Amino acid sequence: MKKFLVLLTPALIAGNIVYAAELDLSREALEKATGISLGYNTSWTSHYVWRGESQSSKDMSPAIGADLGHSSGLYTGVWTGAITNSTIPSEFDWYFGYATDFGPISIDIGDLYYFYPGETDETQFNEYYLSLGTEIPLGMVAEDFSISPYVYLAYAPKWYGANTPDVFYTEAGVEASIPGTPFSLSYTFGNIDVDDLEGDAEKANTVDSWNYYYISFGFGEVLGLDTSVTYHNAPGYKGDAGQDGFFISLGHEW
């Protein structure tokens, strides 16, 4: 599966650029008639890091996804990417939710399901999330300068099966455009709070809470691909999967 994704992703990136105009026309007609919008995305990263934890053993990870939305604010989507910590080296995510604006505040609430083919049912889990964000123009600094802060809260009950901990995720970040350029800077800080396991001290000691942070520099579009480089770190994480480092990300949406 990983080889398939590695071979498929460059073809999807090239193909979506060639046919983007034609697809946009079809989707525009669909959205006008029904309020339904379709979106697709493909990406490649030199290292898949999830909340400070390596999912690809520092190997590259291609990914593809699709989104279906409605003018009411309801949406659903799927995503799959290559990982190395599963019997079948792929992760499949399915999510649905509701997004709207309340004045200047963007609100997003939903459910994200993580599925790992070949693993037991206990490995699969749900994450219920709430995201709040806004954009703050700073015209007194520069005409095209703004910052975009956000907060992301999530709860995953029984993280990996019965008699395993509940997990709370807290994440906050901010992105700032660099005036007069296509570049941007962003900073993210998060915490994974793992509850102690009830009645199982041995398992309780195998998982710890940890903090993580990312510092990213975005280059804007380079040859039609959104390009960025990120430094990541997970202070307090026990294990090699939390080692710090850099990764490069390429992506395209159509």
Where are the regions that the model predicts?
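Short glycine/proline- and aromatic-enriched beta-strand/turn motifs that initiate or cap beta-hairpins
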Residues: 21-84
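Transmembrane beta-strands of outer-membrane beta-barrel pores
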Residues: 44-50, 80-84, 100-102, 113-117, ...
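Detector for outer-membrane/organellar transmembrane beta-barrel domains
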Residues: 125-205
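Transmembrane beta-strands of outer-membrane beta-barrel proteins
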Residues: 38-42, 64, 74-76, 94, ...
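Glycine- and aromatic-enriched membrane insertion/assembly motifs of diderm outer-membrane
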Residues: 57-113, 219
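Residues that define the transmembrane beta-barrel architecture of outer-membrane proteins
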Residues: 34-36, 58-62, 88-92, 105, ...
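Short loop/turn motifs that connect adjacent beta-strands in outer-membrane beta-barrel proteins
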Residues: 21-37, 73, 101-106, 118-121, ...
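Outer-membrane beta-barrel "beta-signal"
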Residues: 219-223, 241-254
